Structures are given as C-alpha cells and as structure tokens.
Amino acid sequence: MSWQTYVDDHLMCDIEGHEGHRLTAAAIVGHDGSVWAQSATFPQFKPEEMNGIMTDFNEPGHLAPTGLHLGGTKYMVIQGEAGAVTRGKKGTGGITIKKTGQALVFGIYEEPVTPGQCNMVVGRLGDYLLEQGL
C-alpha cells in the first residue's frame, strides 16, 4: 500500500459515525522533514517549522512560548503527550501531530470536526505505524 493511500483512506476519511465530517488536511512526514504523502490541502511548510516541531517532541514545552507554526499558520500549543503527541488550537480548528519511530502523522481540522475526533483519527494511524515498526 502506498503512503498516499494511508493519507487518503485513513486520515482524510469520513469520521466514524459522522458521515461527511473529515479532517481539512493531513500528511505523513519523515522525521527529516521529507513528505511521504499529503492531502492536496496540506500547507506548504518551511524546514524551520518542521525543525521546531521535532524539537518539541525531543524537548517537550519548546513550542509553548512561541506557538506551533505550520505553513505560516500559528497554533497555540495545548496539552499533548510528551514525546508522543503535540496538539495545537487556532480559532474553531486545530492540529494533532503523532510521532512514530520514523514519521510524524499530521491531522488539521475545523468545526464541525472536534479535537477529540482529530486525535482519534491521527492516533489510530500513528499507533498502527508504531506497531509496524515505522
């Protein structure tokens, strides 16, 4: 299965029990910042933004003072799981990033999708990749 299939079928899918509700953008990005696969709507990010995100996983709290930036959009960092999950909020939407052994799984959402639904979608694929040694 291609990485694009994982994004299309497992991240950009309808939210379970909520037909028509889905993430607004998603991607799988290697720890080195290389894009493995992304939705057409995923923002073009700068290398320094990805470096900041990786630093936050290695040094939890790194992004809290400045915010999480992706594609020029600033998200307020909210509670995640140190070294495993980073979450951000902006207006009625937000972002969830799950770190696996080799990649970062990104999910970006807007209402009516909830933070919990985004966390579930991103976490499920992230956990699967971890189980596969990825």
From Swiss-Prot:
GO CC terms in record: cell cortex; cytoskeleton
Record-listed Phosphothreonine modification sites: T114
Positions of disulphide bridges: C13-C118
Chain segments annotated as transmembrane: none
Broad class of the protein's primary localization: cytoplasm
Highest taxon in the source lineage: Eukaryota
Example of a GO MF term: actin monomer binding
Tagged with keyword Cell wall biogenesis/degradation: no
SUPFAM superfamilies, per the entry: Profilin (actin-binding protein)
Motif (Involved in PIP2 interaction): 84-100
SMART domains: PROF
Post-translational modification: Phosphorylated by MAP kinases.
Keyword list, A-Z: Actin-binding, Allergen, Cytoplasm, Cytoskeleton, Disulfide bond, Phosphoprotein
Localization per Swiss-Prot or TrEMBL: Cytoplasm, Cytoskeleton
Additional notes on this entry: The variability of the residues taking part of IgE-binding epitopes might be responsible of the difference in cross-reactivity among olive pollen cultivars, and between distantly related pollen species, leading to a variable range of allergy reactions among atopic patients.
Physiological role: Binds to actin and affects the structure of the cytoskeleton. At high concentrations, profilin prevents the polymerization of actin, whereas it enhances it at low concentrations.
Record-stated family: Belongs to the profilin family.
Entry-linked PANTHER family: PROFILIN, PROFILIN-5
Subunit structure as annotated in this protein's UniProt entry: Occurs in many kinds of cells as a complex with monomeric actin in a 1:1 ratio.
Record-given protein name: Profilin-2
Organism: Olea europaea
